[in-house]
């Protein structure tokens, strides 16, 4: 995929896979906005990458962010929503289930609100 000159939003773009994705897209010439719940904890975000704060579980904030950043061509969701529920499904407690579903809602919010503001033939990547 050619990304030079494309506009990209990377949720979870300040650490881990999201940060690596933001760096790669920027190095290939994309205009990148890295979105994080906690941008103050951002890793080594490259120069030229814009940082924005937003929690993927907050629908109002997501809607506002997408309106402000539109239109864009590439949408990446690598946000975990914070806590992680790890373990066999039947051995998790109710908090673990809630954490898992919160993460799912985060992905749903990215896709639901993001597609309204994407350019035609845009690309979505869910990590």
Task: List each language-model region with its residue ranges.
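Rossmann-fold cofactor-recognition segment
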Residues: 46-60
């Amino acid at each position: 995929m050619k990304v030079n000159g494309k506009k990209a939003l990377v949720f979870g773009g300040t650490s881990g896979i999201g940060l690596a994705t933001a760096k790669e897209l920027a190095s290939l010439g994309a205009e990148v906005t890295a979105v994080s719940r906690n941008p103050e904890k951002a890793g080594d975000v490259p120069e030229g990458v814009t940082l924005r704060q937003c929690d993927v579980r907050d629908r109002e904030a997501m809607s506002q962010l997408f309106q402000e950043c539109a239109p864009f061509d590439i949408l990446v969701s690598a946000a975990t929503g914070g806590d992680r529920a790890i373990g066999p499904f039947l051995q998790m407690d109710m908090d673990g289930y809630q954490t898992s579903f919160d993460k799912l809602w985060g992905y749903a919010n990215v896709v639901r609100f993001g597609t309204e503001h994407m350019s035609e033939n845009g690309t979505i990547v869910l990590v």
